[in-house]
A protein has these predicted regions:
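Intrinsically disordered, glycine-rich low-complexity segments
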Residues: 4-9
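Conserved beta-strand/loop scaffold segments within soluble protein domains that form the structured core
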Residues: 15-256
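A structural signal for small-residue-enriched, beta-sheet-centric alpha/beta enzyme cores
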Residues: 175-345
Length: 345
């Protein structure tokens, strides 16, 4: 009997090792005594995941909170950070960071370390971060990082693939980037390239959202062609994806805020048009995540269940203020207003 149990334990351990070997970070959340709890938690260099079991939030709200941290304060050239998150049925999880994700300059690898897979046509390494996430029935995942901050000459790529179990699954996903080290004039929007792509599917791989951005500096040294020139006084680009029944209040708040802000003229928001300069404050673009799905639901008399909010801001505090206000209704789901858990105003 003991021999059989030992073999089972060994096989189980091998499965865990195989699973964790594919990722720098792994989170699994399932119900334990009716409480959302981390039943699998793993991280390795360059990522560390913190799971505070005692949080000073509303204890009547069931939510598991996680914080990701980069060793050394940021990601260096060629770092690959694959992460897996599985939020199972009826659970709630929030994944945050403890500061901006700093991405340092891309460098040429030594010939001994040149594998051919992580080196591009310019013979420099790209830093890459990936996420594979699953959200179960009636579950909610809130992905609430601080923004990426790419240093001069950095190359950064993000790929997020999120699978929702069905229409009862809910998601709040924030993806954003700042201009970089704005205290240095030559480091503003001075990274080489930034690519981010988020794909959200439901059930039978029906695509809900494909949200992507690509920012690149021109190969020439012509200042007029530089990314900094093209971005004008924009300092932050952000996108927020809200899907599912548990984000309904936040979706309504986003729509109301954008509608109200379109009437403001100073230190606030206006609708962004292709040729207009960015005003002081914030500009918005608001859309449903799936036009075909929305049209079908409207014919049935039901409410839209998805929203994508895109934000341009002239400073990072304005962007934080927008996120705090628009996502504040999620407090009832996760126990604390997003981006306010560290005492933000």
């Amino acid at each position: 009997m003991n021999g059989g149990r030992e073999r089972e334990d060994k096989i189980a351990m091998m499965e865990v090792e195989k699973e964790t070997a594919a990722f720098a970070g792994l989170i699994e959340v399932s119900l334990q005594s009716s409480i959302s709890s981390a039943t699998k938690l793993f991280s390795t260099y360059p990522l560390r995941i913190l799971y505070p079991k005692k949080v000073q939030f509303d204890k009547s709200v069931d939510c598991a909170w996680f914080y990701t941290v980069s060793y050394g304060g940021g990601l260096v050239s060629g770092d690959l950070v694959p992460m897996s998150v599985d939020v199972q049925k009826d659970c709630t999880a929030s994944v945050c960071t403890q500061g901006t994700t700093k991405v340092y300059k891309s460098i040429k690898p030594s010939s001994a370390n040149c594998t051919g897979n992580d080196v591009d046509s310019e013979n420099t390494k790209t830093t890459k971060q990936t996420l594979e996430a699953k959200v179960g029935t009636n579950a909610l995942l809130c992905w609430l990082p601080d923004p990426a901050q790419c240093f001069k000459d950095a190359k950064f790529e993000q790929v997020h693939e999120i699978s929702l179990a069905d229409d009862s699954s809910s998601l709040c996903f924030v993806d954003w980037i700042t201009a970089g080290r704005v205290a240095h004039d030559d480091a503003r929007w001075a990274f080489r390239s930034f690519l981010t792509r988020t794909t959200v599917t439901t059930g039978d791989d029906t695509v809900n959202v494909i949200e992507s951005q690509r920012l690149e500096n021109a190969a020439s040294n012509n200042e007029e062609e530089s990314l900094a020139k093209r971005m004008a006084n924009a300092h932050v680009i952000a996108s927020v994806i809200l899907i599912g029944p548990r984000t309904e209040a936040a979706r309504k708040k986003c729509a109301e805020y954008a509608k109200d802000s379109s009437k403001r003229t100073t230190n606030a928001a206006s609708w962004l048009t292709a040729k207009s300069p960015l005003p002081a404050g914030v500009s918005y673009s608001l859309a449903t995540a799936s036009e075909s799905k929305t049209q079908r639901m409207n014919e049935e008399g039901n409410e839209k269940d998805s929203l994508v909010l895109r934000v341009l801001a002239s400073d990072i505090e304005s962007a934080y203020a927008v996120l705090r206000e628009c996502l504040q209704p999620l407090e009832t789901e996760i126990g604390c207003p997003p981006y306010n858990e560290r005492g933000g105003s």
